[in-house]
């Protein structure tokens, strides 16, 4: 099992509740989690309910054929950063890189971690 982040991975789902998500077909122009992430791997994800504006960003683990994703760790959400009890409706489920996990170079070429103390300073200088 590896942590995999990939571009253009986006599917639909109609799963409700707080449990694992059944992943549907790839949206037009995108690929499935099976193709882009791979069986039994983990990835950062976003789930967005189109009808209610519920959202969740977290770390998920795919099952053996990448058709189900277990919501392992919640990073942020519309439920005060706790697991979301998703209502009925169509959801977009896609691979993402959460801002709190980003590492980038500042104007001087120094590495800055978004969760680190230097992030606020770098942002204040940039503004």
Which ranges hold each PLM region?
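Glycine-rich, low-complexity segments
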Residues: 1-30, 66, 75-127
């Amino acid at each position: 099992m590896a942590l995999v982040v990939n571009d253009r991975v986006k599917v639909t789902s109609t799963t409700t509740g707080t449990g694992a998500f059944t992943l549907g077909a790839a949206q037009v122009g995108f690929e499935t989690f099976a193709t882009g992430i791979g069986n039994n791997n983990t990835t950062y994800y976003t789930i967005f309910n189109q009808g209610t504006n519920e959202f969740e960003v977290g770390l998920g683990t795919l099952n053996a054929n990448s058709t189900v994703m277990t919501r392992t760790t919640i990073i942020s959400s519309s439920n005060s950063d706790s697991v979301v009890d998703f209502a009925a409706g169509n959801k977009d489920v896609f691979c993402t890189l959460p801002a709190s996990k980003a590492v980038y170079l500042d104007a001087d070429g120094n590495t800055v971690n978004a969760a680190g103390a230097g992030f606020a300073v770098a942002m204040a200088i940039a503004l």
